[in-house]
């Protein structure tokens, strides 16, 4: 008998032994525009942000004006370091990965600034080269989007990093002095001049043609602000920036509106608003140079890349979505092991399915993830469980999942609690008709399983669910026959109707999967 998807994943995980410890980790990012502290918990492969604070110190402005980090910008940075040291100690972070990028790298008094900053922080600060920054940024994208294939572009205040990623590797990389603050200084605020500088610099990147007609992964706070603005302008229903995807032509058109100041930016935070026209122009010219098929936003960047770089290859290969769901199940479900039984129980559910937005492997992966967290709303009022579980899935800091995947899981897990989708609170978020049917059928099968087993392990292995072309068959062993009742008959029938096939209930010997 061939191994199921779940069996293969469990086998791969067992061979790795214990994951790296999940003591709180901290990263301090000293950028050209802001200084940010992020504290993480969870496993090293799926770091969960537990604290995130930034201060807009604008060190790059000081460097552009005088060549040094001095004055009010320096004083604010040092005040921030004192506070962040106290916060890191409060969080229990023993090792703080502190690094600095373009502004500190380019400052005439870089060594002096770093020495004083290290005294205030109590930790060493690593000044990254431009090339290291590009590699770490690409690593951060791959931590959250393992299948990334294309160009990673990270726009900061002092520089623009580009890296080609493919097959979970960084192939080529370069750092260019095309950060927003640097460009505004070099071009004296003239967007036409700034555009010429960007075009000239990109023309020298010989390997850029290798990523033509691939995905462009955009990184950096100003580009994220631009993407958020685009989501608002188009009425996009899911307010999650990570893995937000946009048609390249549509984004290029929108960038033109921003760079020519033909659209309202009032909803953008004031500390980002002035930089948006320049950032939009850089993105527009970059898209002209590489002709991407799509734009994907990554919430992960250099900070996460620093953590990812410390992982051994065997841990990098672990699925970040499934690991995150396992950790969530341990925190929020009645039984963490029940989800694995449920994943095996539903293994034959999609044997004849033909998803439209997902490959068969991706559908199985989403099914596994859904099984792991299908009980996370158990302690909420029954009237609100469908809404709670849907909103949790839609907004959880998951990585390694597309927006279509989030919506699929949210709809499926809502049906696990409530047949009437009006009560799901999904605000019209839908998939294609075929994939929506799959989500409904999956959710109603989970509803059947939880009724059969009381959401606890030990029962499902004595039953079998099998979906054929014409019948959905539930077999219950004779030892567990007492578990049958009207609610099981009803929920089996409803699940079968969702698949468009007949419900069959049997008792006795279990067939092989």
Task: Identify the residue ranges that each predicted region occupies.
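N-terminal basic/disordered segments at the start of proteins
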Residues: 19-48
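A short acidic Gly-Thr/Ser loop motif
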Residues: 28-34, 153-159, 219-222, 299-301
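Short coil-to-beta-strand
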Residues: 47-57, 171-176, 315
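Dinucleotide-binding Rossmann-like beta1-alpha1 core, especially the glycine-rich loop
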Residues: 98
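A short amphipathic beta-strand at an alpha->beta junction
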Residues: 293, 499-513
